[in-house]
Amino acid sequence: GDVYKRQAERMYHNFPQVFRGDAFIDARSSTSLRCAMSMSYFTERLKELNPGLQVNRRAYHRYMDYIAYTSPEGEKFASEKAPWRRSFREFEKKNVRPERLMASLFVKPEAITDQDAMMRSLYWIAADMQNVELDLSFYDIFEYEELVGVWKTVNARMYVCNAAAPLNGGLMPRCAVPLLRNILESADAAIEKGTPAADLRFGHDTHLIRLLALMQIEGCSNQEVDMEKFHLAWQDYRVSPMGANLQLIFYRDKKNNILVKFLLNECEVTLPLKSKMVPYYSWKEVETFLAEIIGKE
């Protein structure tokens, strides 16, 4: 929860004009308890900083059609029976090398029937221990090359199943079309009505990755056909670390023009659009660009 509280605090202080007075904040979440709790931590911190804020929090099933949508074709592509999984399993076998690790941990390593699975499980335990307040690490049971090998397989799967990998033919990023459409509609409504001051969505990393690839956010839509080079083109920890977030910050200039800036994980990023004011873009031009992406059915 501390991750989201700190994010909320930074957002509050970075954009004080948004969260002043009795501003209305609309927050929606996936029905996943984890996502709903993230929404709660984030918005409660905003309320602590300004008790006058009017915050509407919802986690309804009807929002799942855009917050966490995967098309039937996408589900089939990502399934364990998909044709691409055959070459991926060979890639896994090449990169997940458990022999040394098992021998270092167990007197009788041959008793471990699935050593690859054991190594992956230990990898995830080591990774997840970063999320608890223990002054202890399991990473030291691995050699550097072993960690890199397992990560390459994790990264490759995330890239193929969610990002702009040519292997999925754009199928997976297009699962984010409903979410992008909701963003455009919500932005236009807020610009016209002047409310809500902030429109917040709390969802899942895979769906954020798809959205970023679809929008062609800087560094998020790189393409590579060689599985051995996926890690050079796209890195999951850069695109979607713990608490990953995309922020669209809107500004109105003295001529009443609407500008927008994009922050990925609270860092300024660009779109493949020309602008004399980068990282600021004309909202009209951005909206046209994104609407064209949505229209490519």
Description of each model-found segment:
Residues 1-2, 6-26, 30-297:
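Signature for phosphate-centric chemistry
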